[in-house]
């Protein structure tokens, strides 16, 4: 019996080892699962002084639309900044799409490898903020006497807080804090083939209404017996093309004072006014008067080819519009000569205009090293200096975000030379910039919250799906709209973000229950350790008994 008992441990050792291996494996899985989430960083605290004895290497992610002039502005800004701060080295990574920047940032948050400074949008920042201390709040940095806006220790002529256009700065406030600085601002403009409007017997108003646009567009669909459009003598004519249908829906709702969302994240877009707008889209897609960029391609190409009368696009795309545009995506022999006019986007009530404010902002990512964050903040501020602001704004129909740069002698000289050439001083580009400066008080932005970027995409999807359905000969009625609302709500998971209350900080604290897989993993791990404990206890009791 004694001999048999001595062999027993060998018989049970294997299960014990298996159990131990299983426990370690489960623990490893749990560790890896934890690593997949965002890496927490301590809250940023401003250092008392900037340590100039150290070298810093910071990364800057930017967007340039493949515009070499914009790239040159960035490169010159980095060179000038590094001359002032030789211990700070800036590595720039260029993107051609804001969504790719957004996706890469989200991916890198999980691994703690975000850039230091990033060109972005407030909607995107709201998502970044779901991680703990991922973005550095800028309120205290703004006010810091030494290194803040217009601070005494800056080695450049920085802008003070009251020198930033208030409307543009307010767009960078999310919840109770500022998380970005505005970098450039634009809006949307209506680019018009004025020659064709007058050819159809109409006079182009200073502020066209939606009714005017629809009426002229429907009129332009008339064809001759051979199928050529009467207005241009060609086989192709899309009178009205809108590039960004999310902006189209958002601005229509704002002009109608209709609900879109609350600042707390309550989704309100699925309403009767939206339904009315979609039926309007239905009617004019059916006549061939209206299409979108996603369906038909870039509106500027059709406009320049004499195949479009009204093209809505960003003022930041003005250098692609018109017969003499410095940038073209079509062959020279396709371009038609016409007079181009720049107008505000269509309005329901021109006496009370509303147009969206858009354009990139700059955020600073938090890091374990507060000195590194301060170095990043210094570079971010440098992007608001006059030379950078005017240099970049002049590449397109952008507007500098500081009153200081707007009123500078260099920028005023640039505006005064409108039409002097068809490159740097291209008249359409400067007209577009002046449109925004003259309407800054009429601009607005949508509420920002975690999920607001998805809501924006959903707004455009409603128009896109309605237009596609008409082109596919589907019946677009109330039943269709009801189904569309449900599909879009599900596709963009709006039902999962609707009705949130409180600040983003509150939302992070209220994360809800653990996912089922996490619960199962934790339970399995606990069970494994319990079994190991029971086995060891049993073995100990046996040893005691046989002693």
Give the label of every model feature segment.
Residues 170-183, 188, 212-267:
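Extracytoplasmic/periplasmic solute-binding protein
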Residues 1-58, 493-547:
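Short, low-complexity disordered leader/linker segments with a strong preference
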Residues 50, 122-187, 229-230, 334-346:
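Hinge/lid segment of periplasmic solute-binding proteins
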Residues 340-347, 393-467:
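Long, aromatic- and glycine/proline-rich binding clefts that accommodate carbohydrate-like moieties
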Residues 89, 283-290, 326-404:
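Extracytoplasmic/periplasmic substrate-recognition and gating elements
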Residues 216-218, 262-296, 340-341, 345:
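Glycine-centered hinge/linker elements that transmit conformational signals in sensory
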Residues 55-60, 64-126:
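Early extracytoplasmic/lumenal segment of secretory-pathway proteins
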């Amino acid at each position: 019996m004694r001999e048999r008992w001595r062999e027993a441990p060998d018989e049970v050792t294997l299960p014990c080892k298996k159990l131990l291996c299983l426990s370690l494996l489960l623990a490893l899985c749990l560790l890896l699962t934890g690593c997949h989430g965002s890496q927490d960083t301590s809250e940023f605290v401003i250092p008392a002084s900037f340590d100039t004895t150290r070298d810093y290497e910071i990364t800057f992610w930017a967007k340039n639309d493949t515009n070499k002039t914009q790239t040159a502005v960035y490169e010159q800004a980095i060179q000038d900044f590094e001359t002032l701060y030789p211990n700070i080295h800036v590595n720039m990574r260029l993107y051609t799409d804001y969504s790719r920047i957004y996706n890469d940032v989200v991916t890198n948050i999980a691994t703690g490898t975000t850039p230091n400074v990033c060109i972005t949008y407030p909607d995107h920042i709201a998502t970044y903020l779901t991680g703990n201390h991922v973005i550095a709040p800028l309120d205290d940095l703004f006010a810091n006497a030494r290194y803040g806006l217009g601070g005494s220790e800056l080695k450049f002529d920085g802008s003070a807080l009251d020198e930033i256009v208030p409307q543009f700065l307010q767009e960078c406030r999310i919840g109770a804090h500022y998380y970005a600085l505005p970098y450039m601002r634009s809006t949307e403009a209506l680019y018009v083939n004025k020659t064709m409007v007058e050819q159809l017997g109409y006079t182009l108003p200073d502020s066209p209404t939606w009714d005017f646009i629809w009426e002229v567009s429907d009129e332009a669909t008339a064809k001759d017996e051979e199928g050529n459009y009467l207005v241009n003598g060609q086989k192709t004519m899309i009178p009205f093309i809108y590039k960004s249908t999310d902006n189209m829906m958002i601005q229509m709702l704002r002009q109608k004072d209709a609900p879109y969302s609350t600042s707390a994240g309550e989704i309100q877009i699925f309403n009767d006014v939206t339904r009315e707008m979609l039926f309007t889209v239905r009617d004019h897609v059916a006549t061939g008067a209206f299409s979108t960029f996603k369906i038909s391609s870039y509106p500027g190409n059709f406009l320049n080819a004499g195949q479009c009368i009204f093209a809505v696009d960003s003022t930041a795309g003005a250098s692609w519009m018109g017969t003499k545009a410095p940038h073209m995506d079509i062959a020279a022999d396709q371009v038609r000569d016409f007079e181009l006019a720049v107008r505000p986007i269509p309005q329901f009530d021109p006496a009370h205009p509303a147009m969206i404010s858009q354009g990139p902002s700059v955020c600073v990512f938090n890091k374990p090293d507060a000195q590194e964050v301060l170095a990043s903040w210094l570079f971010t501020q440098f992007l608001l200096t006059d030379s950078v602001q005017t240099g970049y704004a002049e590449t397109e129909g952008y507007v500098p975000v500081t009153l200081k740069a707007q009123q500078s002698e260099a920028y005023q000289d640039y505006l005064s030379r409108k039409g002097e050439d068809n490159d740097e001083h291209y008249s359409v580009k400067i007209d577009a910039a002046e449109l925004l400066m003259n309407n800054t008080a009429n601009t607005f932005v949508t509420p920002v919250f975690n999920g607001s970027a998805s809501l924006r995409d959903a707004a455009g999807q409603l128009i896109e799906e309605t237009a596609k359905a008409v082109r596919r000969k589907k019946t677009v009625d109330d039943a269709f709209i009801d189904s569309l609302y449900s599909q879009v709500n599900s596709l963009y998971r709006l039902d999962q973000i609707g009705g949130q209350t409180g600040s983003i900080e509150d939302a992070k604290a209220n994360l809800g229950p653990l996912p089922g897989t996490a619960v199962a993993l934790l339970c399995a791990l606990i069970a494994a350790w319990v079994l190991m404990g029971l086995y060891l206890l049993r073995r100990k009791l046996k040893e005691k008994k046989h002693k």
